[in-house]
Amino acid sequence: LLCYTYMIIITTVNLKEITMKLSESTVSFLKNYANINQSLEFREGSTLRTVSPLNTILASVEIGEDFPKTFPIYELNRFLGTLSLFKDPELVFSESSVSIKDGSHESTYHYCGSSSMFQTPPEKEIDFPDAEVSFELSEDIFKKTINAANTLGLPEVVVQGDGKEIYILVSDTANVTSDSFSTVVGSTDKTFRMIFKLENLSKIMEGTYDVRLSSK
C-alpha cells in the first residue's frame, strides 16, 4: 500500500502597479460632472458617463486616458479637491483605493462601498430617436442665453420654431407678461416649442454643441 502526501504551496503574486495621470481636459470634464451628480462610477475604459439623481441629464464623453478598472467615488468634488493638492499627480490603483502621488507627497483615497449607493447611468447607450429639429449652438450664444436667464431671473430656456427660424430664448412660460431674451440659431419649416428647465441646462459644460431635439 503506497501513501502519498501532497503539499500545496500558495504564494501571493504582487501585481505590477497600474498608474496613470489625468489631463487638464479630463479634470475639467470631471468638475462639470460633479455639478450633475456628486458621485461617479469610473468604469474601465476611456468613456466617462454620468446621470443626474432625477435622471434629467445624461452625459457621456470619450477621454484620452484609459481607466484600468471600475471603481465608485461617492464625493467627486472631494476627490478632485484631493487631486488639486498635488502639482503633477500620478494615480496608482489598487483593489480598494487609489493612491495619489507626486514626489514625496502621497494621499490614499478609498473607493466607496458600492455604486448602488447613488444613481448611475445605464450600461448601454441610449437609442436616441430621429431628430425632429437640429441646429448648432455656439459657445457664445450658449453663454449669453444662460447669463440672460440668470440676469432676468427667468427659470426656463425655450427652443421654438415659427415655420421660418429657430429661436433659443429664456422666459417664464407660466407668466404671460414675462420678460425674455432670444437669439436666432437656425432655420426651419416646422412650428414647435420645447421647454427646458434652466437648472438642468446650466449644469452643461460651456462649449459649442450640435443640438438634436425630439419630442419622443
Segments predicted by a language model, with ranges:
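DNA polymerase processivity clamps
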Residues: C3-C112, F128-K216
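Acidic/charged, solvent-exposed loop-and-adjacent secondary-structure segments enriched in E/D, K/R, S/T
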Residues: P121
